[in-house]
C-alpha cells in the first residue's frame, strides 16, 4: 500500500513556465498543481517535450517559474535547494575520482564529518551491489554501475526528498529493472519523498504511489492516478491483472490525448 502521512512535503501551485525564443514565447508548462506527501513516491509521466524535466528543475529551485509557486515545508522556494538529492539521466561522475570518492564529493561540498560520511557512502554502495567496486574509476564501471554511484552520491547527506530526471533512460532493460529494485529498497529504508520523471509507463506503475500523467506541450496535468499495489514490489507484480489495469488506464489517457495513435 502507499505510504502517506497526510502532510504535503512538496506543493506545486499553479505553476507555469514560458520561454522566450526567436520565434516568440513558448509555453512549456501551463498551470500545473500537485502535492507530494511525506514518504510518497510520485512519478511524472508524459511525452517528450511536455515539460517534465522543466517541472523538476523548478521544484529543485534551479529554474525560475514564470508564475505559480513551489512550497516546501510551508516555505516558498526562491533559490536553489540544498535540502534535496538530485539524480540526472547522465551520472556526471568525475573521471579522476573513484566510485567512493565520487559519492564523497557531496559530503565534501557540504563539509560533513568525513568519517561518518564515508561509512554512509560505503553502506550505500553496498546496498546497491557495488561492494568491491569502491576504488574503481568511472571508466572501469558499466553504465548501470555509474548510475548507481550517482544515486548514492545524491543520498549520502540523507535528504528527505530525492528528485530524479529520467535516471534510467540510457540503460538497458535488465539494468533498469535491477536499479528500479535497488531504488525501491533505498526509498523504503529511508522513507524519503521521491519525485521521479520518466517516459516509461511500466516503470512509473511499478515504482510509484502516484503517477502524474502529463499532456503534450504545453504541459498540463491530464490525470493523477493512485497506485494501490502491495509493497515491497517484486518484478512479478507486472504480471498481475491489477498492474495491467493501471497500465491500460494510463495508456488510454495517452490515446485520448493523441500521444499514442493506433491504426
Where are these regions (language model features)?
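Catalytic Walker B motif of ABC-type/P-loop ATPase nucleotide-binding domains
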Residues: 162-165
